[in-house]
Amino acid sequence: TSGGNIIHTFTSSGTLLPTETASLLIVAGGGGGANSNGGAGGAGGLIEDTSKWLGNKNYTVTVGAGGGVDPGLNGANSSISGILLAAAVGGGAGVYSGNAGTGGSGGGGGGQTSGASAGGAGTSGQGNAGGAGHTAINGAGGGGGGSGAVGAAGGDTAGGDGGAGSA
């Protein structure tokens, strides 16, 4: 309880039994990063609903896991059954080469001399795109997208910063 509000926090899947109007914040699992000079994983998608009537009913809560690394894998979706039409989409994977993962927020592209890859796209209303990798000898990977901003592009020797989160 905080300031008269009851807070239910789920770090794994379970059941929610509310009795009134609630504010919901649903976050999906983040994407995994790639190896070497690869890009960073994107943040899990974020859905916020500040005034949702829930009534007296059981809801199944699914908490998405983060994506594995080396190679990067997309994060898993999070949802509350019967409340929202869309799930919070898992974050996109960062890549060493090829296309960065799309997701709640996109993964960062890999840096390579043979052609850096673009960052992955984010899901509208949930997150932002990842940054591109840098084309240079030992070019660095891009930062993963965040819920509040796009990931930065990689530089000659340093990876791009991840996108900012939301307050």
Where are these predicted regions, by residue range?
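Glycine-biased low-complexity/repetitive sequence motifs
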Residues: 1-167
